[in-house]
Amino acid sequence: MKTVLMLLLCSCYFIKQVNGQENNEVIKPDFITQIPRDIEGCTGLYTFDSTAFKKKAYIIETDLRQTAYIKINGKLIKLKLLNNKNLPGETYKSTYSGDGYTVILISKTVKQIDVEKSLDSGTLEIIKDKQKLKVKVHGISGC
């Protein structure tokens, strides 16, 4: 009887540990190397790595209107715009949500490339449950 009880307790503990690991999965953004079809026209393309930027590999892609994409742990996630704010100093804050994630992109125009395009820098914050990841990003936005 004691053996059965010990096995039962060990099994319960193991199941709790496995479930806990699933809920505490680390947020790991992956590079998106192909722009999704519904992102066309004006875009915001951001990464945290200059080499990746040259290779056209981004961690967030937006249509500068209603849709953005991120790739987390190998899964492409479509996000919908919740809120867009103009902040002082050519700074913009866009909040997106989808598939349990909240994503906050804050970008500031660093250099105007031409009439319709600018070089931007800022931060990207990805939140899911109690997990948060905040990274510096840079990229290009415009039409």
Language-model features and meaning:
Residues 21-143:
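Cysteine-centric segments in proteins
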